[in-house]
Curated annotation (Swiss-Prot):
PANTHER family: PROTEIN FMC1 HOMOLOG. Residues 94-113 are annotated as: Disordered. Plays a role in the assembly/stability of the mitochondrial membrane ATP synthase (F(1)F(0) ATP synthase or Complex V). This is Protein FMC1 homolog. CDD domains: Complex1_LYR_FMC1 (cd20271). One of its GO terms (cellular component) is mitochondrion.
Length: 113
């Protein structure tokens, strides 16, 4: 994982992932226990002065790790849906999956010189 960035950036990222999850379930994300926990935890560990707080850094690291997990799960599901085996594929579909196109014969199918 790269540098952590700001806690507010991590918090907004977590809320974005909660919105993606709630869109799948149909419930508003603000009604979930995860949303209430995140807001409560980030408010409790908010630093108002320039003091260093180990608990805030631990919370930020755990939140960034959880954000990485949620993003990875969402991307995995999208890739799985796109490339999951659907039985036997045609040659054109298989070529399209890897970004290739098959050559076309000038006279159409069955063309002979």
């Amino acid at each position: 994982m790269a540098a952590l960035g700001s806690p507010s950036h991590t918090f907004r990222g977590l809320l974005r992932e909660l919105r993606y999850l709630s869109a799948a379930t149909g419930r508003p994300y603000r009604d979930t226990a995860a949303y209430r926990y995140l807001v409560k935890a980030f408010r409790a560990h908010r630093v108002t002065s320039e003091k260093l707080c180990r608990a805030q850094h631990e919370l930020h690291f755990q939140a960034a790790t959880y954000l990485c997990l949620l993003r990875s799960i969402r991307k995995h599901v999208a890739l799985h849906q796109e490339f999951h085996g659907k039985g036997e594929r045609s040659v054109e579909e298989s070529a399209g999956l890897v970004g290739l196109k098959l050559p076309h014969q000038p006279g159409g199918k069955g063309w002979e010189p």
